[in-house]
Design a protein with these regions (language model features):
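Conserved N-terminal alpha-helix of the aminotransferase class I/II PLP-enzyme fold
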Residues: 278, 323-364, 369
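Gly-rich Lys/Arg/Thr-decorated short loops/hinges at beta-loop-alpha junctions or inter-strand turns
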Residues: 4-10, 118-120, 144-150, 177-181, ...
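Short Gly/Ser/Thr- and Asp/Glu-enriched loop/turn motifs at secondary-structure junctions
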Residues: 177-184, 211-218, 364, 406
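Conserved PLP-binding catalytic core of the aspartate aminotransferase-like
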Residues: 159, 172-201, 221-224
Length: 470
């Protein structure tokens, strides 16, 4: 029921169990009640399923991990966010549009910049700047290389393996409960089989499955699943049921998706997704783009403080090893001891480097780190009975993400002046801190500053803020 206090709905497509719902009627009711609809969608499934924009969704979002980014134990992947044209001035992140250079040549450049935090600062629509640009580039090149036909072939192959497993595991006495699905199956077990039996057999074959609280068992297929893996999965259920099974030599293309849910429209229609489908073409295309880029291979480049680093090729090389790439984030902890040791070691080293007692490795960008720090400060202040403190002092030289993050975390901002060299104006800092001392929560300062300067007065700056109770 759409009560008056509901302003939006979030739907999953497919849902967490893998079932694909037909939301058309629900979306009509939501819009009739003046509710917006946001959909978390598996981007690869949309090669086969009707896209949410065609059945009325206002926003579609998700991760592009499925477009060529390995699991990395739940590590980074780029998100995607799509919406209607009418909302373009409110969406987070960068928008790129067509323009012309001074010679009249068509070019790409940032568009609608007046909505972004480097101009709008505390009035920006988000604190996002360039988080996960590398992963977004990888996903883009994946789509360029495979093109619409290649993407569809991959999606059809995944769905066909799922359909094959549904058909043959059902024959063994199980019941697949997802009425419609893309790549994920959920099986109700017969009375003669327990989830623990299946778990024991699966682990003996080095397979992890999903075990639901009600006793159901689930699995998800992806582009790395081949006929051999499908046979292993089938054998697990057959052995548990004590029944014979036939090994597949090949799995034909098949679809169980209903006509109402099947995608009919085209996608990836831009010419760039339809030109570079061989290794040589792709390599030359990437190199042409590379020649247009300014990087550390050419000269000094301006970098934000959260990206003042250089990852050498030698450091990137280990990331191509399957031990790093292929670890699923939900594996049992005893199967991820190496990863956990890396995480723990890095956390301990960062504690020593920073001089702090605790570390979070969850933030995926500088902007996310800012937000995390501010939320920790807010929680601390509330815990000591100082929750009324809601002002953040920020130097005028700070990157726009700083005031934007402060607003996102529920604070208000007070700007502190800087001198001609970009240093904090100490007199103005003292005055602003004293003026707001009863409500001051924190100072947000970049070290080195956005100008690349280490504040020589940093110790005195911290003393002033602490004296004000912040």
């Amino acid at each position: 029921e759409m009560t008056p206090d509901i302003f939006a709905c979030i739907l999953q497509y497919p849902n967490a169990s893998g079932n694909v719902e037909d939301y058309r009627t629900f979306v009509e009711k939501a819009h009739a009640a003046n509710c917006k609809v946001a959909v978390a969608a598996d981007i690869l499934s949309l090669a086969l399923l009707t896209p949410p924009g065609e059945w009325g969704a206002d926003i579609v979002f998700g991760t592009t991990q499925r477009l060529g980014t390995p699991m990395f134990y739940g590590g980074p992947s780029a998100g995607y966010f799509a919406t209607r044209d009418e909302y373009k001035r409110n969406i987070p992140g960068r928008i790129i549009g067509w323009s012309k250079d001074k010679y009249g040549k068509l070019c790409y450049r940032m568009a609608l910049q007046t909505r972004e935090q480097h101009i709008k600062r505390e009035k920006a629509t988000s604190n996002i700047c360039t988080a996960q640009a590398l992963l977004a580039t990888m996903a883009g090149f994946y789509a360029v290389y495979h093109g619409p036909e290649g993407i569809r072939t991959i999606a059809e192959r995944i769905h066909s393996i799922a359909a094959y497993l549904e058909k043959n595991i059902n024959k063994l006495g199980y019941k697949q409960v997802n009425e419609q699905y893309f790549d994920t199956l959920r099986f109700a077990l017969p009375d003669t089989v327990s989830a623990q039996q299946i778990r024991t057999i699966a682990l003996s074959k080095e397979v992890n499955l999903r075990y639901f609280h009600n006793g159901d068992v689930g699995m998800s297929i992806d582009e790395t699943t081949d006929v051999s893996a499908a046979n292993i999965l089938l054998s697990i259920f057959a052995i548990a049921a004590g029944k014979d099974w036939t090994k597949a030599e090949d799995i034909p293309v098949n679809s169980t998706i209903s006509k109402a849910l099947k995608r009919q429209s085209s996608y990836l229609t831009h010419e760039v997704f339809n030109k570079y489908h061989t290794e040589t073409e792709m390599m030359r295309y990437i190199k042409r783009l590379d020649r247009k880029d300014i990087s550390l291979a050419h000269s000094m480049i301006s970098l934000g403080s959260c990206t003042m680093k250089l990852n050498a090729a030698a450091e990137m090389l280990p990331l191509s090893r399957p031990e790093f790439m292929c670890m699923h984030p939900l594996v049992p902890e005893d199967q991820a001891e190496g990863y956990r040791e890396l995480i723990n070691n890095l956390s301990e080293e960062l504690k020593v480097i920073t001089g702090f007692a605790g570390v979070s490795l969850q933030p995926n960008s500088g902007a996310a780190g800012e937000y995390t720090g501010l939320r920790v400060i807010r929680a601390y202040l509330e815990n000591i009975g100082q929750g009324h403190r809601n002002k953040i002092l920020i130097p005028a030289s700070a990157h726009g993400t700083n005031p934007a993050s402060a607003i996102q975390a529920g604070f208000t901002t007070v700007t502190c002046a800087c001198d001609a060299q970009g240093n904090v104006d100490m007199d103005d800092l003292r005055a602003k801190a004293e003026e707001n001392k009863d409500d001051l929560a924190a100072l947000m300062i970049t070290y080195p500053s956005t100008h690349g300067i280490f504040e020589t007065e940093i110790v005195e700056i911290c003393r002033i803020i602490h004296e004000c109770g912040a």
